[in-house]
């Protein structure tokens, strides 16, 4: 069956009741009775007219205003009525109480829901008891499947229901005649407050929550309404989370039914709980009358409670027997939570230090100290009972305690708790105290008793609360932020925590015996005394009156007070009455709950930005944590607690860093390529510029260039010298040879062996003018040839610029391209230019807005702090006892012989043979485990999900898709498939530990192999499962002589040790800038790898050429350019167009990234673009519609060393060369190359000439 109701059948909605009117509506007089046979048509018409007038008048008066009150007559009538009432009161007083408790009126939300619920919900009953509700929603009737019983409606009860275990619902079609009673439903659930039977329901973060106590078993099936009266969810149960309860609900989305079940949910079906008495079962809330009330039969009532202690309805039975099912008692809500304490009593217990360094049996002995609350509050359990007077009733300012065998009371104002100083007591109830204490190594509790004596007990206890947040403060701040924490909730209402109670032992008291003339007198004093005398025979028994044992001595008798009509706490310092584990249970007040704590925010540090580093000046008011990490592949995490003024220098790279100071939010910064010098200046400025960016590469390049220049000059000089020598050698060896004038000039030959230039040229002019002109043109021709060679060389070298080589290797999306690879970097835009015949080019932009890498987890176990349960020891007087087997974690049991325990009244045993003590202990989960535990997981393949913004044409839409190469999403008619990602990387190891909101890569022991004092010393599948494993090296020790106690040794909690030594979490050291989050465990925004994209874009997404503007004469002029800065370049494009419109803009090289994807074309023919580049001399091709041009710029370095955003361009892999630097290199290389080529040419020519001779 479809569990989504329809909205088709609505004849009416709920009709509000008529408004309440304090006045009485006058009734019309009844018409006289007329016999039908005697009525004439005229009379009938008159009667019909009267009837219509009466109905109209009645309707008008009901909807009209209140009638005016008469002035005299009603007052007299009222006065007479008051007088009559006074007379009646004097005669017979009313049985009502003087101050009856007013019934709480329902609020506006409750009234609204009650009106709607009158029609659409029906009770579900089992054996006459309401167990839940069924709701009419749309065209269906829905009932929770776990609610047992039959709907209290004959038409609905006989329907055939289809059950769904997935949704915990039973569903059937509504009968036709009831469809008008059904409620509408809606899947729209904006965050805010909704209504249900018990008031407001808060909806936030996909969860419905209510104040704890507003819902209870029996509310299953109740609907939750919005303000329009539409059903948004059906309640199934709830999970107690402290101050609030999370509801388990069935609700609807647009297309399907969903069920939300928070952890720890309990079904709210009011199932009938049964208890047993003498093999006869009865409802726990209605105990049998023999016994049924503690005040009438206390001892029998306690035995009945002990027989039912493990039954689910135990607390219903406890409440019923304490209140005796008297409804008048329930109205006293202030004392309701203290009713159970009348069945208990305080006790005296052994205390090793009673404040003066000596042991005693103290009425305020300290049993336990709990410090699980992260806000520093502690909970102390003592032997006295607070908030109860000696009569057993609630009295807030009293403390009742045991003094001997008597119950006494003292003022609560004298109660004090000390560590290194006085503690602030925040709450008290029964055996428990909650207080804020300063750090210390001991704890003492004391009070002034009724005789003004100080009763105290001191124990060794190290109180050093861990800081909440990242600052170790001592005083709650006026201003700060709220962070999650745990605290003890100051409520005395019943909780899920409980303590065991048992029947107290017989208390020996030698003062009950007195010697009188050879006889022993037992003075009962109104108590029941159990006595045992060895003189004579038959001197064993109990008595409630004074008794004399003849011919006996005190040393031969043993007397003890016995009282089994009250419970006392199962203390390890007090023996239990019998070996059987008979016990009762009572709730523990002040439960641990999740809360928020206000923590201070450290003063903002003074920050000085430097070149690729920042200096923070820190002024802590208290120890404050400083952490930082790199956002690259190597995070290099660092943390330090700082308690005084310091300065710290943090290195910053282009990959970015993240630092956090105290409770301030984390700050992310990135370095820019700032430097001194200019990339477009003189050679020394260019060298200084590159030295600031790439010092090692610059030194190597300048050294190599200098060496090349020196070598070139030396080689040229050597070649010229060699050529000169070869030219002059023949003339030097020939006697009388004359060196020609030209050769002499070129080779610097001595003038003595050659004619002058004028004489040589005059001779050639006279003898041969042709040779004259050739001789004159030879040097000129050589110069012209050399210049042409250098020019061609420079033209060939210019295209080999490094910048051009980089740009040539950049992939560009061509026409009909339907695949792409985008970088997995949040905020880094990827753009592709798509050209199709007959269509205007279109720019496709893909930008990753967020990624989530979620591993598949398998929960191995949870671990937390343990508590050691030590039941009261059983002492067998004059005999032996044996250990019993128990299925308890780390259960230990030992029997010690030869013990002679003493209590405050004397020896506990009186016999000639040895006594034995049975000591037991075992381990259980601490009560804090529900709030403070670590979960050990095995992590498997991680699934990546990305949120990507897709822009093309007029479409700009965000979509979420799995990056696996299979998941396809449709955006604006186009289909996109992302993945799989190029790098199969995850920050999570195979084994991880999740603790609160932190994740740790840790190799933990498998289930069942925990070691004492290590992580995993106790293990269980959940915080409530019965499969608890423990290995804590628990060992029992022999009790000290004369003392009742259960000593033991045990390894400290491995979980608490792990908390102190767990190190840095993955949240603070994950590489690639990953942000680790929990619920579910995931890594967000990890900048690693690339995402392949396959797309199918339909033709409808393109613009036809005839519809797009025709752009011609496109030219680009760069006005401002700052490289390595986020869109620090501004380019102005001028063009001509035939009409206005919209054109796609795209850069065809990854040298520059253009911010705009499309621009509006206007008739003025001018647009401005912003671009980002890492090159000092970028040259990139830009297209606007179908027109293209090349933009060339001379960029300057950025001025800001550190910026709070990452770069939006591709970084250069190798050092980039500016155009000016290339020009200087070309000039120097050209000059040196020309000189070297000239030397080579001269040497070759001379060599060739000399070889021909």
Curated annotation (Swiss-Prot):
Cellular component terms per the entry's GO annotation: host cell cytoplasm; host cell nucleus; host cell plasma membrane; membrane; T=4 icosahedral viral capsid; virion membrane
GO MF term (any one): structural molecule activity
Region (E1 fusion peptide loop): 899-916
Site, Involved in dimerization of the capsid protein: residue positions: 194, 227
Listed result of changing residue 539 to H: In strain: HuN1
Cleavage (site feature) positions: 268-269, 332-333, 754-755, 815-816
Biased composition (Basic residues): 66-79, 93-108
Lipidation (S-palmitoyl cysteine): 747-748, 1248
Region listing for Dimerization of the capsid protein, in residue ranges: 190-200, 226-230
Region span, Functions as an uncleaved signal peptide for the precursor of protein E3/E2: 269-280
Reported modifications of this chain: Structural polyprotein: Specific enzymatic cleavages in vivo yield mature proteins. Capsid protein is auto-cleaved during polyprotein translation, unmasking a signal peptide at the N-terminus of the precursor of E3/E2. The remaining polyprotein is then targeted to the host endoplasmic reticulum, where host signal peptidase cleaves it into pE2, 6K and E1 proteins. pE2 is further processed to mature E3 and E2 by host furin in trans-Golgi vesicle.
Motif (Nuclear export signal) on chain: 151-161
Effect in UniProt of substituting residue 655 to E: In strain: Isolate MM 2021
Region feature Interaction with spike glycoprotein E2, mapped onto this chain: 162-167
Result for mutant: residue 70 to S: In strain: Isolate MM 2021
Coiled-coil stretches: none
Cytoplasmic side: 716-754, 791-792, 1249-1253
Note: Belongs to the Old World alphaviruses that usually cause fever, maculopapular rash, arthralgia and myalgia.
Protein name: Structural polyprotein
Organism: Getah virus
Lineage: Viruses, Riboviria, Orthornavirae, Kitrinoviricota, Alsuviricetes
